[in-house]
Each structure stands twice: as C-alpha cells, then as structure tokens.
C-alpha cells in the first residue's frame, strides 16, 4: 500500500520527540501493539536519523520525519528512510524536495492563503498547526472553499478530542504529548500506558463513526 493511502486509512500519526533510538524503538513497538503504526520522528530528537533508519526496518510501521525545516533536512531524512516529511511551517523547498524523492509532503500552514499555497506547490496533505488555536470549526469551514485539500490538524490534538477534528473533515491528526509524553524512564508501565492510549484513540475514532 502506498504511504499516502496508509496515512489516510490510519488517521493518527504518533509524534515521537526527544527520545534516543533505543527508547524510541520501544515506544514505537508499544504504539504498534495498540494499533497505531504511523510514526513521526522529529528531527530535533537525539539520533533522529538513526531512529528513522531503525524504525524503517521494523515490520508493519510507516515512519516519517517531523520538524523538518528546510530542503537539506528533508533530503537527509529521506535518505535515512523517511516515507513522509512533516514541517511546522510552510517552506516551498521542503515540499519540492519531498516530491523530488517521491515521498509524501505534509507542510505546516495556519491560514487559508498558506493552505492554498502549499496545495498549489504539490503538498499531499497540509498540517494545520497549531490546531487548537483554530479548532475543529476551522477544519469544517475549509471544506467549503477548498474541499480538495487534505488537512491534518496537529498541536494540542489529544486522544480524547481527535475524533472531533476527524468528524469536521480532517483526513488525520498528529498526536503528540497526549499520546507519547516525555519521560526519563521508559519502563514497562510507561509502554503499557502508551499501548492503552493508542487503543483508546482507535476506539474513540470508531465510536464517533470515523473509519480507522
């Protein structure tokens, strides 16, 4: 299955930020056990490219890079195995680099003008960031003038409120600290908690009539 289709079907991208590779792999496996297999490794994490390489070799996971700020960073992440590129802001060179290498481009945008620019430059999905500042109503309102644009709200989206964004028309959500918060102790209890939260996300999405 193509990466874009996996994202559209999976609905939730788990953001792994600030962890060294060994702990990131443990977290990713817990997420997979909970049913979340779309993983974003942020480039401001320790050993981020190594983590992307390691997770790209894990069966059943689709790994992308986040906090990608320019074309050079995008290229490095892609060479490490990233299948999609996420950015917090709109930078055309990052979109173009992703497209050049045939990976999914998900730039950040905050206004209708930025969203349209990203779409016209070839972005596959637009990351609406920070999402909670705009709310689900913004996602719904954008369906009128720009129904062809795929939106993925991120930033303040939680396991509990994700379904409201999906119901409003988002093709997926980015799940950060509400799913994987930062801790110094990645022990069995922490991993069990992540697995439980991942399962909860899928259950809530299904209960609210959103296919996962």
Give, region by region, the residue ranges found by the protein language model.
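Histidine/lysine/aspartate-rich catalytic loop segments that bind and position anionic ligands
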Residues: 91-124, 128-133
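Glycine-rich beta-to-alpha transition loops that act as phosphate-gripper elements at the mouths
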Residues: 17-20, 65-71, 87-90, 107-112, ...
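Conserved functional loop/turn residues at catalytic and ligand-binding sites
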Residues: 35, 59, 81, 89, ...
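Conserved N-terminal beta1-alpha1 strand-loop-helix module at the mouth
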Residues: 1-83, 100, 160, 184, ...
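Glycine-rich phosphate-binding active-site loops on the catalytic face of alpha/beta enzymes
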Residues: 88-94, 128-136, 168-191, 197
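Catalytic cores of alpha/beta
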Residues: 70-80, 113-121, 138, 157-173
